[in-house]
Amino acid sequence: MAKAKFERTKPHVNIGTIGHIDHGKTTLTAAITKVLHDKYPDLNPFTPFDEIDKAPEERQRGITISIAHVEYQTESRHYAHVDCPGHADYIKNMITGAAQMDGAILVVAATDGPMPQTREHVLLARQVGVPALVVALNKCDMVDDEELIELVEMEVRELLSEYEFPGDDIPVVRVAAFPALNGDAKWGESVLELMNAVDEYIPTPERDTEKPFLMPVEDVFTITGRGTVITGRIERGIVKVGEEVEILGIREASQKSTVTGVEMFRKLLDEGQAGENVGLLLRGTKREDVERGMVVAKPGTTTPHTNFEASVYILSKEEGGRHTPFFNNYRPQFYFRTTDVTGVVTLPEGTEMVMPGDNTEMAVELIQPIAMDEGLRFAIREGGRTVGAGRVTKITK
């Protein structure tokens, strides 16, 4: 079956829903697709709740994690939307998900107000550099008291300001996803209002299309008769069908291959651009030669490293971080782009220990090489829990 070509006429923006479990992230995601389908039927399919809810699953450490990808269009933009899972104790995919966002819709139930995961997700959005948030104050059909809604809105704004988002300026839109999903006209209108706020407030990202091509590997699979497909979000540059690429990181040797196909949302493209989630079909590459944590890049433009210096922030106990200090030779995991790599920390001379809540410089030696440049962000994690965030300031080896 011939695949439809993807029309690249509108600006493309990656967004997602974040927030506390059961505050209505998935219901809102479904409601957005329904309301936009009703308003612009030619542009939008409706994606039902069940389809988003039973997102493709990955099992890790006995917990099932899923991320659903849906696409929709407003009059001015094309959106790719990820619905993030809501486990407070398990943010691995939230990190890969949040790292893929040009902006996010923070869903807060008016019936509950901000909860622990609300705070955690806002913190995480700041760490992984989500540039802008819009708030959907959900379940407003269930709160009769106007003052109560105003109080919750105030709490949310204070929380955003605390994590260095412009809490006073961020749009807070009152919605009710469930009635909107069931065709209620008034609440359907509220979802359109939300999407107007997203259109206006979340900036069209400056894509890094001018830079040399690089894409972190998220997943690898084999398509019978066609070869190996590598999926991920293109971090920078453009990749065209027929170009040579290099696959590097994690292992000692790098390998070269040729891109024989690029696809996005099951549609074939001539090229993939920075910011897009694509699958690359690679000639002659075996599935076992590629793993999550590697990158696919323009040959000769990036190199894997194990040793670097970094500036980091260590989460306080209240933010869900460590309860105790750490010392020289601390060995956590360093989460770069899509994967964790263990590393050994050397503290600066004169620093005996680092307390939760501190900022510090540190030198790190990783046990596996990661493709990196100065400025690359990472999370510091222990057993799947984020305990710090940092940026590479200098590559030493």
Curated annotation (Swiss-Prot):
Its EC number is 3.6.5.3. GO terms for molecular function: GTP binding; GTPase activity; translation elongation factor activity. Its main location: cytoplasm. Mg(2+) binds at T26. It is found in: Cytoplasm. Keywords: Cytoplasm, Elongation factor, GTP-binding, Hydrolase, Magnesium, Metal-binding, Nucleotide-binding, Protein biosynthesis. Residues 138-141 are annotated as: G4. Residues 19-26 are annotated as: G1. It comes from the Bacteria. Residues 10-206 form the tr-type G domain. GTP binds at residues 19-26, 83-87, 138-141. It catalyses: GTP + H2O = GDP + phosphate + H(+). InterPro entries: EF-Tu_GTP-bd, EF-Tu_GTPase, EFTu-like_2, EFTU_2, G_TR_CS, P-loop_NTPase, Small_GTP-bd, T_Tr_GTP-bd_dom. Gene3D superfamilies: P-loop containing nucleotide triphosphate hydrolases, Translation factors. Residues 62-66 are annotated as: G2. One of its GO terms (cellular component) is cytosol. It holds the Pfam family GTP_EFTU_D3. Residues 83-86 are annotated as: G3. The keyword Cytoplasm applies. Signal peptide: none annotated. Residues 176-178 are annotated as: G5. GTP hydrolase that promotes the GTP-dependent binding of aminoacyl-tRNA to the A-site of ribosomes during protein biosynthesis. Belongs to the TRAFAC class translation factor GTPase superfamily. Classic translation factor GTPase family. EF-Tu/EF-1A subfamily. Monomer. This is Elongation factor Tu. It comes from Nocardioides sp. (strain ATCC BAA-499 / JS614).
